[in-house]
Amino acid sequence: MSELTSLTIAEAREKLRAKEITAIELTEAYISAIDAANERLNAYVKVTPDLARVMARKSDERIAAGTAGELEGIPLGIKDLFATVGVHTQACSHILDGFEPRYESTVTQNLWDDGAVMLGKLNMDEFAMGSSNETSYYGPVINPWRAEGSNQQLVPGGSSGGSAAAVAAHLCAGATATDTGGSIRQPAAFTGTVGIKPTYGRCSRWGTVAFASSLDQAGPIARDVRDAAILLKSMASVDAKDTTSVDLPVPDYEAVLGQSLKGMKIGIPNEYRVDGMPEEIETLWRQGIAWLKDAGADIVDISLPHTKYALPAYYIVAPAEASSNLARYDGVRYGLRVDGKDIVDMYEKTRAAGFGKEVKRRIMIGTYVLSAGYYDAYYIRAQKVRTLIKRDFELAFDAGVDAILTPATPSSAFGVADENLAADPVKMYLNDIFTVTVNMAGLPGIAVPAGLDQKGLPLGLQLIGKAFDEETLFKTAYVIEQAAGKFTPAKWW
């Protein structure tokens, strides 16, 4: 069975098409793997084995009939932020207890239309607010990686921690995820997987629980660059139900893998050399530069002068949008309801009981910066900074840069229930220091594993591209992957 779960999506696709394996065999292998491991890793909050078997059998029928889709028979995990008809969708929050949508998100519908099989819903930070997957109502996800000679439990990153852990532990062939400030790229870096946040508007947001609507974007987490390319092609589409989705053709991302980087310009931003950055992150960055140089790319220094303002601006804009989006959860129509003496009391008690501490903190921050006395001082200024950040990237790309290379995270994975981070939320927010600029500018960014630190934990590099030029990111990330090799955790679970 483990031989089947070790197949990449590309490998499984070939074996399914050649009828060397069946979709039901592949699906059963993943169901067994989840049964054996989920109690320890807590990657899934809802497993759907019966539904998976039904979908797999239908895939086998289509393969036999010669009408197989692009992802026919491939078992996937779905982040608990995507609406799935009749299946638990709670954004890992108590306030959405028992919610089973009557509609399907556009992203998941695209995957099912291409023949993919749903294994279940994946754990995440509550409402996607977090960088460690510790804010989930269902408890933390445990990273499949451990430091050499240590049994300490590590976080997988967040908010898409369940997606990253499940992919790294081979509990699904690939997974959907979302990224508002780094929630695909940071967990990918922490788990030795590949994660891409596409350009804002590349994937529909319809049917995805909203955190910050101008920043949220769906994307895949996968075992390697090729699998990420295959998944994004299926996930992406224009959608009449989402006016922010863009009507552009979705390229065949897989087709660019292996193309030459000769003559490409890779920008290295000075501002990403932050105080206190570990030497091994700097070394990895230099190694990435050397790999791209060896592949024929030209390396140029660039300046993104407003980078230092990105994190504070992000933590004004994102909570402000969250404060508005989360106002709809009141206990009236769906989810948790705590009775009160009147409707206002019921609202207050429901929201007090239903939201976790981090979500409440961000709602309070958002409500504060939107209040009459502070709107101009905070929110409007943050939006102006956002425009300047976007302009920095535009100037770099206008000067001929094709992609930008940076570290993905300021460190490797840290321990579950880290007291330093628990005591100071700002330290936790600093995990997003290399990733939030990409969301603020609406650009695509990919995290690709590039090495291990001195403790034997994975580290990633990030590539940032021009709007709707994910092809260049895949092509360049593939070169890094070929040079670095792939990384798999030693099995303990």
UniProtKB/Swiss-Prot annotation:
Keywords: ATP-binding, Ligase, Nucleotide-binding, Protein biosynthesis. It is an enzyme of class 6 (ligase). InterPro entries: Amidase, Amidase_CS, Amidase_dom, AS_sf, GatA. Signal peptide: none annotated. It comes from the Bacteria. SUPFAM superfamilies: Amidase signature (AS) enzymes (SSF75304). Its EC number is 6.3.5.7. GO terms for molecular function: ATP binding; glutaminyl-tRNA synthase (glutamine-hydrolyzing) activity. PANTHER family: GLUTAMYL-TRNA(GLN) AMIDOTRANSFERASE SUBUNIT A (PTHR11895:SF151), TRANSAMIDASE (PTHR11895). This is Glutamyl-tRNA(Gln) amidotransferase subunit A. It comes from Rhizobium etli (strain ATCC 51251 / DSM 11541 / JCM 21823 / NBRC 15573 / CFN 42).
